[in-house]
Amino acid sequence: MTKKHNGSQRVFGRRGRRDIPLENDAMFAEVMRRKDLCIGLLETIFEGRRIRDIVYEDGLSPEAQKYIAFNPGNKSIRLDVYFEDGDTVYDIEIQKADKGNLPKRTRMYSSMMDANMLDKGLEYEELKDSYVIFICMFDPFEKGLARYTFRSICEEAEGLPLGDGRCIMFLNTKGSIGELGSDMDAFFGYINGGVSSIG
């Protein structure tokens, strides 16, 4: 029997010589450099999904603070944590303050991730599914939900998905307790007030 990863129990709340708030970008990226912690977090976010393995571009660890740029004169992006799971790529971001730009920002991130993964000469069908996930320490849409998930659908035909393989997700750490289960509640609790340790 494969041991279940539990991100909320195995990742957070440990103390050492240097305690740093987990919402710190660099600290979050450092924690996510461990494969078991990445898997644990994904299985906490996607309850019921079994993640057997994840693959990093360097073969060793996720790309923390991944930098993507195409033309010197155009805007570049820096992703907090970027990694792959089979035919899916993930970008996970921590956002402490509401700057009012998340919808357009996620559009930019998703588009540049697509352009970065599709080499010249490859077919569009070779694009991997993608998730851009923002863990927000505020309610980005002020609806009280703990999770907001967006996919492309047709406005004229109800229930008709575009099927482009793109998903944008916002996790609201101030959302309703119990909505996403006890593991996610524990994770949100650590994000809101917990620390992780290095050293």
Set out the residue ranges of the language-model regions:
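Elongated, amphipathic alpha-helical interaction scaffolds
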Residues: 1-199
